[in-house]
Amino acid sequence: MDSSKRQFLQQLGVLTAGASLVPLAQAKFSFSPERHGGSTQQRYAMLVDLRRCIGCQACTVSCAIENQTPQGEFRTHVNQYQVQVADKVTNVLLPRLCNHCDNPPCVPVCPVQATFQREDGIVVVDNTRCVGCAYCVQACPYDARFINHETQTADKCTFCVHRLEAGLLPACVESCVGGARIIGDIRDPQSRISQLIHTHHDAIKVLKPENNTAPHVFYLGLDEAFVTPLMGRAQPALWQEV
């Protein structure tokens, strides 16, 4: 960590040492922060069709290679959960990533405005500004953020924005064996994602809707147990050593 970031954290600690804690819901944060980058004509979102996901972790591996995340740290992964409904216990595969919310709670808590939302809805981190305080990590209700132990800055899925801007698909979408991940512009009614959302409107779900974050990762075939606060206990990923 460079000296300017270290000095900022020291000053932040002095300022907050004697401060009273205020619940986030009562804090005077703006949940409509200024957006920049991207185009207002687009709104990127992802649809995950769980009927097609086989848990192969190709998305996890390709993302790690594309974005060069440190070993053991991932921007996306597929968790396996056991869910009990009545007397029946089933295993459920659930791909997890940043939800690129319309009301992202990670943005207003950043003391240096390193986390921001682009005009096209993609939430990104400016690593040149991030001081690694981890406020955004704690604020994210989806556990989609982590502090990269190599860069000492916040890290997360960006929908591979560098690839989107080059006319390419995100690494996870391109590598998905079952074609379970679909990304596109939901402001374009002719886009594949828009048509799928329209066709399966009643079956489309999001994680933790009670948080009112307006997530833009949609799930098709999601078990009802995951719509309410996450139930079921995460098992080790199938490809990891335990």
Q: Where are these predicted regions, by residue range?
A:
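Non-ligating segments of multi-cofactor redox enzymes
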Residues: 1-242
